[in-house]
Amino acid sequence: MRVFQRSTCRMPVSRATVTILLGILFGFSITYYLTALKSLTNPIICGPEQQIGGFDYLDVISQRADADVFTRSQSLPGHRRGLILVAIMTAAKYVDTRAYNVWKTWAQHIPGRVLIFVAEGTESVHEDMPLIRLKGVDDTYPPQKKSFAMVKWLAENMADEYDWFLRADDDLYIRGEELALFLRSVDSSKAHIIGQAGLGNSAEYGLLALGSTDNYCMGGPGIVMSRDTLLKVSPHLESCLQHMLTSHEDVELGRCIRKHVGVACTWNYEMQKLFHNNQSAIKESYAKNMKELKDAITLHPIKDPAVMRKVHLRNREIKLREARAKRSLLSSELSTAKAQTLVRMTPNRTNDLTPWEYINNNKILFCADRVNCPRHTVDLSIRTEMADTITQLFDEFNTNARQRGRVLQFQSLQYGYMRVEPTKGVDYVLDMLLWFKKFRPPNRTTISVRRHAYVQQTFGKLRSLSEGVFRSNMRANSTLIEDPTLHMIMPLRGRAAIFARFAQHLKSICARGGDDLAVSLTIVLYSSEDEMENRETIEMLRASFIPVTVIEMGDVSFSRGVALMRGAETLPANALLFFTDVDMLFTCDALKRIKSNTILNAQIYFPIVFSEFSHESWSENDKLLADAFHYGRGRGYFRHFGYGLAAMYKADLMDVGGFDTKIEGWGKEDVDLFEKAIKNGRLRVIRVPEPGLVHIYHPIHCDENMPTAQKDMCHGSKAASLASIDTLVEQIAQYT
């Protein structure tokens, strides 16, 4: 056994060695002290007179005094950089539209900071936007100078603050959570430039002075640069700007980075999905189909602010769905959770059974107890929900696909069943065709298989919210005060007896409505043979202390759209308008629901009215009923295709564009207004069956000289109002 003992020998240390060590220690101390002192004495806000950098045409300037936004900090010990800074380029004509829309949507969900770069002298009415004004830069297109100046500003002011920098346009949508997840998987200490690689379109291919193996990151879908890339390219921006070979700023930025940093854009096929660029139909990009959103980090181009808000809402829905699914999964793992079962409710009676609806190849729906049953085209809402369900289903299937060495891909839906349990959720039985792929050697194979999937979507917990809190939240941005009076606007030409019935009914409603139901009536009166009788009825209403305003139209062609707009023009912007017809009867509760379902600057109400069939088709029991407020299958139907009755505030009517006053005669003006309200994007449209609104049957006469679209609508409404399907079947049965 060998024993090791500590030596007692000491090596002599010379005086020169000690002096060198002390000098090194003293030098480090002085350097640290001077660095810290410099960081304290340097200005942190770029004032109007301060130049950044050495080039006049690349100098940049900020005139907003927000120290949190424009901080030039040094890397102090323990300083931790943020993840990403998004730099958005925009022009003066878009700063208050596209740029502000971006700032209010996806920019609020970026895990870092967002700055908006504009030309020198650009002003905005929105003080909350973080604008950076670039000195000596204008809105000349192509924006090479603006792009290079922005990159230089980032390098000299923000390089020590963030690991990643994203150059973006004002028509780009970014999913912040997915961007953060992607960037945290990449080493930020190395030089990177990430985006969708491009070589130019078909007209420019071969004309961009690119080498056989060169590419560039397309500017539209966004360009991500690491901090190292930004610092290395910054000193060479002046030279690159003076020696451009094309007019495309993204091509030249990529060329400059490739030359002086030595990295090129990520040449990866998957980047086409992650940084998605829609080149097929720029004007309608993502307006209808947003299937690319699920797999994308960025979407480009979205030039319409309404579409941008729609895409943002869809993205938040996806995140909410994921959060709910995670909550449901965690809840199911609790020891107190109920065991999962396909039978969520045991019916006690036959009427408690919820019928299943059959879906044939995702195109035809066979249903019961719904509108247009038993067979009709699958609604867009159902198609969208099923697509989301299938996508989520396969995402869960493929969670551990790499470890298992196999992946499942959806092909098509053969058929399916669906039912809605009102207190539980939605149940699906889906027969699907899918690809089963094994990608791990030596058993690589692809097989087409058919499988059944049983899917349950569970509703979230009920929440109660008072009407006062709800309305105050919805109208938080409104500067107008809602008028409590319900202003009914009604065009009238002839039909004295029908108008007398309407007036008598309105008189009785107002008599028992109480103080909380203030109603006024605006009549847009056209000349007719029985005009004097109508005027006598108007005086009777005025004698009943009902405010009545008459707008004289004279002997001109009847146009419902023109009449309703004339009536609305006489009222203030905060007036609650209810467009109605002389054939309508209503209850006091219906008028109160109209008031509660209409919110200024937030919500428009299109009630679905109950329309009577021809009285000749009624059964004897229906004819014996005293009033109109009964709802049998043979008595009438809820007119889902009619939009003539609507409630909204005048400010919202003008915001959506109002009625089309070029339409003459009967129909189409209501459909046009409804479509405008839907496309507006800012206002929510609520549409529900309203049992308190009943349209009394009257013979419909369709003028054959009407435009084709109006004539088809008129004939369709006339046919639908003759009798119920049950009555028609009984009539046919007599001849079989």
Swiss-Prot record:
Binding residues for a divalent metal cation: 583, 698
EC class of the enzyme, as a word: transferase
Statement: the UniProt record of this protein carries the keyword Transmembrane: yes
Tissues in which the UniProt entry reports expression: Expressed in vulva, uterus and oocytes.
The keyword Electron transport is annotated on this UniProt entry: no
Coiled coil regions, renumbered to chain: 277-340
Sugar attachment sites: 278, 348, 443, 477
Catalyses which reaction(s): 3-O-(beta-D-GlcA-(1->3)-beta-D-Gal-(1->3)-beta-D-Gal-(1->4)-beta-D-Xyl)-L-seryl-[protein] + UDP-N-acetyl-alpha-D-galactosamine = 3-O-(beta-D-GalNAc-(1->4)-beta-D-GlcA-(1->3)-beta-D-Gal-(1->3)-beta-D-Gal-(1->4)-beta-D-Xyl)-L-seryl-[protein] + UDP + H(+); 3-O-(beta-D-GlcA-(1->3)-beta-D-GalNAc-(1->4)-beta-D-GlcA-(1->3)-beta-D-Gal-(1->3)-beta-D-Gal-(1->4)-beta-D-Xyl)-L-seryl-[protein] + UDP-N-acetyl-alpha-D-galactosamine = 3-O-(beta-D-GalNAc-(1->4)-beta-D-GlcA-(1->3)-beta-D-GalNAc-(1->4)-beta-D-GlcA-(1->3)-beta-D-Gal-(1->3)-beta-D-Gal-(1->4)-beta-D-Xyl)-L-seryl-[protein] + UDP + H(+); 3-O-{beta-D-GlcA-(1->3)-[beta-D-GalNAc-(1->4)-beta-D-GlcA-(1->3)](n)-beta-D-GalNAc-(1->4)-beta-D-GlcA-(1->3)-beta-D-Gal-(1->3)-beta-D-Gal-(1->4)-beta-D-Xyl}-L-seryl-[protein] + UDP-N-acetyl-alpha-D-galactosamine = 3-O-{[beta-D-GalNAc-(1->4)-beta-D-GlcA-(1->3)](n+1)-beta-D-GalNAc-(1->4)-beta-D-GlcA-(1->3)-beta-D-Gal-(1->3)-beta-D-Gal-(1->4)-beta-D-Xyl}-L-seryl-[protein] + UDP + H(+); 3-O-(beta-D-GalNAc-(1->4)-beta-D-GlcA-(1->3)-beta-D-Gal-(1->3)-beta-D-Gal-(1->4)-beta-D-Xyl)-L-seryl-[protein] + UDP-alpha-D-glucuronate = 3-O-(beta-D-GlcA-(1->3)-beta-D-GalNAc-(1->4)-beta-D-GlcA-(1->3)-beta-D-Gal-(1->3)-beta-D-Gal-(1->4)-beta-D-Xyl)-L-seryl-[protein] + UDP + H(+)
InterPro entries hit by this protein: Chond_GalNAc (IPR008428), CS_glycosyltransferase (IPR051227), Nucleotide-diphossugar_trans (IPR029044)
Disruption phenotype: Mutant hermaphrodites have a defect in the invagination of the vulva epithelium and produce fewer eggs. A similar defect is observed in RNAi-mediated knockdown. In addition, RNAi-mediated knockdown in embryos shows severe cell division defects including cytokinesis reversal and increased number of nuclei per cell resulting in early embryonic death in utero. RNAi-mediated knockdown in adults shows a normal sperm production.
Gene Ontology biological-process entries: egg-laying behavior; morphogenesis of an epithelium; positive regulation of vulval development; reproductive process; vulval development
Organism domain of life: Eukaryota
Cofactors, names only: a divalent metal cation
TM spans (from-to): 17-37
Keywords (A to Z) from UniProt: Coiled coil, Glycoprotein, Golgi apparatus, Membrane, Metal-binding, Signal-anchor, Transferase, Transmembrane, Transmembrane helix
Molecular function in Gene Ontology: enzyme binding; glucuronosyl-N-acetylgalactosaminyl-proteoglycan 4-beta-N-acetylgalactosaminyltransferase activity; glucuronylgalactosylproteoglycan 4-beta-N-acetylgalactosaminyltransferase activity; metal ion binding; N-acetylgalactosaminyl-proteoglycan 3-beta-glucuronosyltransferase activity
Cited Pfam families: CHGN
Lumenal topological domain: 38-736
EC number(s) recorded for this UniProt protein: 2.4.1.174, 2.4.1.175, 2.4.1.226
Subcellular location: Golgi apparatus, Golgi stack membrane
Cellular compartments per GO CC: cytoplasm; Golgi cisterna membrane
Role, per record: Has both beta-1,3-glucuronic acid and beta-1,4-N-acetylgalactosamine transferase activity. The beta-1,3-glucuronic acid transferase activity is controversial as it is not detected using the purified recombinant enzyme. Adds the first N-acetylgalactosamine(GalNAc) to initiate the chondroitin chain. Transfers glucuronic acid (GlcUA) from UDP-GlcUA and GalNAc from UDP-GalNAc to the non-reducing end of the elongating chondroitin polymer. Together with mig-22, required for chondroitin synthesis. Plays a role in early embryonic development by controlling cell division and cytokinesis.
Family, similarity comment: Belongs to the chondroitin N-acetylgalactosaminyltransferase family.
Complex and partners: Interacts with mig-22.
The name this protein goes by in its record: Chondroitin sulfate synthase sqv-5
Provenance organism: Caenorhabditis elegans
